[in-house]
Amino acid sequence: MADDKVAILTDDEEEQKRKYVLADPFNGISREPEPPSNETPSSTETSAIPEEEIDWIEKHCVKINNDLLISKVFYFFFYSAYGSLYPLLPVYYKQLGMSPSQSGLLVGIRYFIEFCSAPFWGVVADRFKKGKIVLLFSLLCWVLFNLGIGFVKPATLRCVPKIRPTTHPTNASHQLTILPTNSSFTSFLTISPKMREKRNLLETRLNVSDTVTLPTAPNMNSEPTLQPQTGEITNRMMDLTLNSSTATPVSPGSVTKETTTVIVTTTKSLPSDQVMLVYDQQEVEAIFLVILVVVIIGEFFSASSVTIVDTVTLQYLGKHRDRYGLQRMWGSLGWGLAMLSVGIGIDYTHIEVLIDGKGCKPPEYRNYQIVFIVFGVLMTMALIVATQFRFRYNHFKNDDSKGKEVEIPQVERNNSTESSEETPTTTSHSQAFNFWDLIKLLCSVQYGSVLFVAWFMGFGYGFVFTFLYWHLEDLNGTTTLFGVCSVLSHVSELTAYFFSHKLIELIGHIRVLYIGLACNTARYIYISYLENAWTVLPMEVLQGVTHAAIWAACISYLSAAVPPELRTSAQGILQGLHLGLGRGCGAMIGGVLVNYFGAAATFRGIGMACLVILLLFALIQWLAVPDEEEDKTMLAERIPVPSSPVPIATIDLVQQQTEDVMPRIEPRLPPKKTKHQEEQEDVNKPAWGVSSSPWVTFVYALYQIKEMMQLTRDNRASEIQPLQGTNENRENSPAGRAQPVPCETHSDPSRNQPSPDAAASQTQTSPAHPSVDPCTEESEEQQAQLAAGGH
């Protein structure tokens, strides 16, 4: 029955079948052959659809790769959830009452945990062939542990008077002046307080023992006044026990020892400019420890999700690994849209804060629970989409073995000293030796300086990711501004990712690093002098150069310097330095610096450090690195580049299975041939065409001027003598040395018409000088034609 159906296929159906075959996904994965029963209904249904509808479906739907579509949708939802929450976490921690150092630790420790846990879970997934289970469990941990942070209750706010700069903050000593109504005296009291705070009542019991002196001025109306250093004045009850030990009279009379108890109650609140809001530090410490535990546990179990999805996506792509950026682009699109939408939504939501005390203006706190709700919904959608991923371990194993079989001969061809009949033991020893060679290569001055720049750029990016919005909020920036900044930075990164290889081929890897460091210097110093938060937008465009182009240049530079079998290790080291160690140190060390010096001063300091590193790096590259031709001709490879939030995704995990499909071709220089020589060999180019070589054009112009001057003096055939002279004349003539191939002069009959006498002299001198010039060894028939043309 199936044979009859195949036999009656029309030409149109054959064409449609061919299109379906061509539209098969180009992922390089060998699909298992499906039974013919599944293919037969599809052909029957196709024949039943009208032609116009078939054309529309073919143009819009048939060529869609379902596997890559799942990857695109997952990246969109995952990074939408990530972008809606994680950039705002430092600002959220600030609202909870944490210091910059605490916030930096909570953000920076994630990178170190991801660096350690992502490879661990990747090995577990490959070893037990449970990639989908590990992926789904990881995404579930993303939802649960991050939503737990949103239910943390903020610390209590207290309204306290500002600390005077002249008082001593550690030893609580208060100077109390009391003037009673019956008599006038001034007592200088040294008070050692023991304070007990509650929410609405602060009781201070002061045990005072000091000397009381009677002044001479009588009848002074006075009120009890209190100048405390710390504590709350409103609703305060103070019990003063005055134990006067001695009395020094100034006027006649004496004061005997007495014990007096004075109760002072004040209800007057200070002005708003003399009070400030502080958090209860004990509650802040408790909140910090709770969130730290949640972050450590949650990141350990959830860090492997993006690594696994990247690996599956690269398996779907197969030999078209350069199209990874097209899949990852949807994640950046979702990040920008989610960040902008959430930022606008938060600006219109506020929460009321209960303040312990009076006299302070309530702060405007935003409701960040919306962020956690949006994160939970989007990450749940990513979890649902992740259930559609297909893991083929048998295929991966077969391709891995094939890749090893092809890779070993490639290594043997590269190493001329190794024989082609090496044993597996020798091969493994060679691979270990090559790994140590890689370590030595990366520790050299040339590549070690590049790795240091990669680490420092990661340091700067981690600091900006954590404290840029923190600083903008200090300048009264809104979350809408944060969303606009996110959109600009992601558009800049995408543009830089897709055009970075052309920029590298144009100016080179090292110059791209120069530009990135210079842009970082300008960006950080500009941010440090901001007065209006919205003026930061022009500098957000530099995000693509300072992050994307730098990352692409570093990974391309190292990948082109190491052999293919060690490229995965080199990229892993670079990712660890840039994405893991660099960003983690930037967030944690930057938090300590902001805590001590402030955000503006820290931005300014890191900007100056970028300038110093730029100068040192340029000096090292100028003095210590040889300027070789290989470095100039090194081409940028289109290596898939992960964007900012990818947690150490080993992009080259499937390196072995792609080397046999798409081997790396070393760039070879073309044979050296000047442009002038190519023009001389081109018989179709007219003789009056300008040469591309400037010095040849200049000499040729001088020669033509000299020739025309000779024509004006003597109208006889003097123009042929310089073009076809003897060896002595040609060696002494600079024009003859400049134009070693004057064959093209024959292509212009109007300029090179020989006279009869010259033609006759040529026929006489050419046998005598057979080696004068290849152009003079012409046949007698050609000489006769030239002579005839002269008449």
Swiss-Prot record:
Residue segments, region Disordered: 22-47, 407-427, 662-687, 723-791
Highest taxon above the source species: Eukaryota
Phosphothreonine carried by residues: T10
Pfam family, one: MFS_1_like
Polar residues compositional bias, start-end: 750-768
Sequence ranges of Low complexity compositional bias: 37-47, 416-427, 782-791
Any GO CC annotation of this UniProt entry: membrane
Positions carrying N-acetylalanine: A2
Subcellular location: Membrane
Alphabetical keyword list: Acetylation, Membrane, Phosphoprotein, Transmembrane, Transmembrane helix
Membrane-topology descriptor: Multi-pass membrane protein
Tissue-specificity statement: Widely expressed. Expression levels in peripheral blood mononuclear cells are highly variable between individuals, including no expression at all.
GO BP terms: antigen processing and presentation of exogenous peptide antigen via MHC class I
Transmembrane regions listed in the UniProt entry: 73-93, 105-125, 132-152, 286-306, 335-355, 369-389, 450-470, 479-499, 507-527, 544-564, 579-599, 605-625
Matching InterPro entries: MFS_assoc_dom, MFS_MFSD6, MFS_trans_sf
The family this protein is said to belong to: Belongs to the major facilitator superfamily. MFSD6 family.
Subunit composition and interactions: May interact with HLA-B62.
Name of the protein in its database record: Major facilitator superfamily domain-containing protein 6
Species whose genome carries this gene: Homo sapiens
